[in-house]
Design a protein with these regions (language model features):
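N-terminal targeting leaders for non-cytosolic proteins
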Residues: 29-131, 141
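Bacterial Sec-dependent N-terminal signal peptides
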Residues: 4-6, 15-45, 244
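Short glycine-rich beta-strand segments
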Residues: 151-154
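Short aromatic-glycine motifs in intrinsically disordered, low-complexity regions
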Residues: 129-140, 228-231
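Terminal, low-complexity interaction segments
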Residues: 176-244
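Extended extracellular/luminal ectodomain segments enriched in beta-structured repeat modules
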Residues: 141-148, 212
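Short coil-to-beta strand junction motifs in C2/discoidin
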Residues: 160-177
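Short beta-strand/loop motifs in extracellular/secreted proteins, especially
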Residues: 134, 147, 173-177
Length: 244
């Protein structure tokens, strides 16, 4: 009888221990993330028409957007500079233009991508030189980890009649955008290399950058001359995942 009693007691203790262990696992905090997908009416209202010389990117003094209360990412930039008023000086503009026509090979199609990713809106990063950069920043001034984002080459960058990626593809060719954080970390995203270019929306892991307050985009490539890159310095981005 004693043996039987001890057996029951031991079984109950093991069950209790197992229950507590499960409880500890359940209390492990789960990672919370926010996704900047540019998909509400506020972003749609910022899509310029026409794509070049439109009222939002060429006739205003500045352009800005923010995703407060969600990812808290934001971007603002001046449209005034030494070349006059317009989107010549770097920045990140909202778009929804899908255009795979290879004859649409000029800057008048600068807000287009050749294919969508299942949603309506995305953003176009443009940064023509080291002096004209595109900057993402957190509006709450706190450092956050950006886990990933999607990238895609634009219609203009791919098919441009002068300096287009498709024209340049060969052994030794390269076109890339580098994302640099305020903490000194950076990541090069290769958009085209040798005979291959990104022509589908592609997910890029940015977690190695660590916690950041700002991200700066700059472009580089092998097709360059005395005045910088010949390749149009554009890339499309979407679905930026931020750890809250």
């Amino acid at each position: 009888m004693k043996k039987y009693y001890y057996l029951i007691a031991a079984t109950l203790m093991m069950g209790t221990m197992t229950f507590v262990s499960c409880n500890d696992d359940d209390n492990t905090p789960t990672e919370q993330t926010a996704v900047l997908d540019f998909e509400n009416d506020k972003f749609t209202a910022l899509i310029d028409n026409p794509q070049y010389n439109g009222p939002l990117l060429y006739q205003a003094d500045s352009y800005q957007w923010e995703d407060n209360g969600n990812s808290n990412l934001s971007c603002s930039f001046s449209l005034n500079g030494s070349w006059g008023k317009g989107w010549f000086y770097g920045g990140i503009a909202i778009s929804n233009y899908i255009d795979a026509d290879e004859t649409h090979n000029s800057f008048t199609y600068q807000l287009s991508v050749p294919k969508g990713n299942g949603s309506n809106n995305f953003a176009i990063v443009q940064a023509g030189s080291a002096d004209n950069q595109a900057i993402l920043k957190f509006s709450d001034s706190k450092a956050h980890v950006i886990k990933s984002m999607q990238v895609m080459n634009t219609t203009y960058a791919l098919y441009a009649s002068w300096g287009g990626i498709k024209q340049g593809l060969k052994d030794g060719y390269k076109f890339a955008v580098t994302v640099k954080a305020d903490n000194g970390a950076s990541k090069e995203i290769v958009l085209a290399e040798n005979k291959t270019a990104i022509e589908n929306w592609t997910n890029v892991d940015l977690s190695s950058l660590g916690a950041v307050k700002t991200l700066t985009f700059t472009f580089s490539g092998t097709d360059a001359g005395d005045y910088g890159l010949n390749t149009p310095a554009y890339v499309a981005i979407d679905n930026i995942v931020v750890v809250k």
